[in-house]
Amino acid sequence: RILINSGVNGSDLVSMPVAMAQLVADSVGGVYPFFAPAVGALGAFIAGSNTVSNLMLSQFQFNTAGLLGLSGAMMVAAQSVGAAAGNMIAIHNVVAASATVGLLGREGITLRKTMLPTLYYLLAAGSLTMLAMYGMGIGDPLLATS
């Protein structure tokens, strides 16, 4: 809630997602779409949920896209795809899966074995995001641009 509602203040300060978007747009620039799914995965790993990751980070992704002149809808979609990957390594999901198959106490092994598929997934998602935004010139469907 603090991250999401940080723009509601008496000092007219920008919200944390907007400030983070400005920093990322200035430092990473046009290659950011490659990393957008990884941000979603990090959010899901921390929050333990694709939905909560999207709630926390969609404003950040959308603003970053706007600052870079890219499709906000595509960037938020990349966020969601990455958050799905992050669910594979979310701790409570690893614990639940380990308990279900009788591997209690071996969560670390399960997590290590899940990391490689997660990384492949994120590399593919980042590459496809770059291809869609730059190679195919897909614009923002919400604004009917191309």
Specify the residue positions occupied by each region the protein language model found.
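Short amphipathic alpha-helical coupling elements at transmembrane boundaries
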Residues: 18-26, 62-67, 109
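Flexible loop linkers connecting adjacent transmembrane helices
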Residues: 10-22, 104-107
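Alpha-helical transmembrane segments of multi-pass membrane proteins
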Residues: 29-44, 68-89
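Juxtamembrane and boundary regions of transmembrane helices in multi-pass small-molecule transporters
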Residues: 84-146
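Alpha-helical transmembrane segments of multi-pass membrane proteins, especially transporters
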Residues: 14, 33-36, 40, 54-59, ...
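Transmembrane helix-loop junctions in multi-pass membrane proteins
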Residues: 1-16, 46-47, 130-140
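Hydrophobic alpha-helical transmembrane segments of multi-pass integral membrane proteins
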Residues: 1-8, 26-60
